[in-house]
Amino acid sequence: MLAKNRLPGSGHTTPSPPASPRRSPRYRHGRSKAAAGSRFPTVQPSRTLAHRLSWILLSVLLRRQGIFLFAPLIYISCMLLYMGTVSFDVVPIIQRRPPPGSVYKSPQVYAKLRPEMDADNSTADAITTIWKHSYKGGEWKPYVNKSTGDLPESNGYIYVEANGGLNQQRTSICNAVAVAGYLNATLVIPNFHYHSIWRDPSKFGDIYDEEFFVSTLSNDVRVVDTIPEYLMERFDHNMTNVYNFRVKAWSPIQYYRDSILPKLLEEKIIRISPFANRLSFDAPQAVQRLRCLANYEALKFSKTILTLGETLVKRMKEQSANHGAKYVSVHLRFEEDMVAFSCCIFDGGNQEKQDMIAARERGWKGKFTKPGRVIRPGAIRQNGKCPLTPLEVGLMLRGMGFNKSTYIFLASGEIYDANRTMAPLLEMFPNLQTKEMLASEEELAPYKNFSSRMAAIDYTVCLHSEVFVTTQGGNFPHFLMGHRRYMFGGHSKTIRPDKRKLAILFDNPNIGWRSFKRQMLNMRSHSDSKGFELKRPNDSIYTFPCPDCMSRRNKTTTPESRPPPAT
């Protein structure tokens, strides 16, 4: 059998090879026209380097399937390398929204409320309708009686140094009277300690009527202005040589009997310095009576201060004649030192920041920059510890129903950045007055550089107002509230705003006037209901005179006389 010749020969027919499979259309363009008639296929163009590497990698992976076990590790390594090349500076920072009440937004609230506030044509005037709370059981009356008869022989002399401002010194005076009476000692007129903050060198007689003070207490406590010569000779006429007791704050009266009286009997003179808040509020009734007698009856401002104060009261009543001779007094604490001490942030920008840093260093020298001390202005504001600004006081009073024509007496020191911060308050209450506006320069000249004497004038005008508004804690409003209760049948006639609630309301620029006014009227009503309160064991008798210093008008009460002599 002849083998078939695979090579073509001329004139011979041979079986043709099987037909080649049709080439995919995607590869048809690879055959050139020159080779179209050729029987031999043309050589394919070489693959690219990327194709070769891909085929090599794929073939390795298919032959070595165990490599897939390392795929997660390879993936993580690649991701770490990638992340190392990315800059995270461009990642957006999500800032948390400040908690409600932590930011000062009162100017925005004022701008939002002012059109509606000015358009409010309510006819009711708060000053004539504010006090509606009825006295449960009837009104109260003062019942501090003076003792009769001669005093027993004195156990010695007590000399105290009263530090602080006007009303902190007042606390020391009244407590010294109580301690001297309890120990059957003779009280030396208290010495006022000069303080760099208050910068007032005034003596007792410059502020109070010394003669009236001594005579009012004459049947209960001996009071002298000097120590006998024979005693001072023992100490070389130097009070620093006298034995000094450093008494703990809020010490009970028994401490004075057990620890101080023996030394007093031995030395016949002792010194207590400092003496601010050195006697607890919880004391026997006989001791409380002496406190009441000293504070509400014996302490009267000097004739010059009292005369000017009463003159300003008369002028305020004359100006407010169309309001029934009634005016509102506001104790505003927005002086530079108060703003600095609070550590709150307002709207004064960088200038305010620099001013406050300088004021803190000037007044407290490093107290606020100690290592580890953290100051959180937002939390301070939320807790109601920031002093109210003049703008906030104006918004609050307008919301409480005091209209634009209300007469306001502003008791304050030098307001921080007054030209800017006082402008909104004057817009809301154009009939606002201060002692500097009511009195002439000649009338104020003797008191100008004495902060305690100026505070005494403010105290007098506030005492006789129909409404007293306190905007910040402190001795001034606490004493004034107690004194007003003593004068007005047990009711303080005082507005004490809820500053925590105010912080939240003033942090809402979207609040409407009706909603804001409703909240303020509720706050006013709450102050009315709290106007009359009985003293609790740890309350100050200088703020809550009932029932230790007062009795019901429909009851006859004979208070306890002087305490028995301590021996």
From Swiss-Prot:
It comes from the Eukaryota. Substrate binds at residues 331-333. Keywords: Carbohydrate metabolism, Cell adhesion, Cell wall biogenesis/degradation, Fucose metabolism, Glycoprotein, Glycosyltransferase, Golgi apparatus, Membrane, Signal-anchor, Transferase, Transmembrane, Transmembrane helix. InterPro entries: FucosylTrfase_pln, GDP-Fuc_O-FucTrfase. Residues 87-567 are lumenal. Residues 1-41 are annotated as: Disordered. It is found in: Golgi apparatus membrane. Residues 23-32 have a biased composition (Basic residues). The chain crosses the membrane at residues 66-86. Residues 1-65 are cytoplasmic. GO terms for cellular component: Golgi apparatus; Golgi membrane. One of its GO terms (biological process) is cell adhesion. GO terms for molecular function: glycosyltransferase activity. Pathway: Protein modification; protein glycosylation. Glycosyltransferase that plays a role in cell adhesion. Belongs to the glycosyltransferase GT106 family. This is Protein ESMERALDA 1. It comes from Arabidopsis thaliana. The gene is ESMD1.
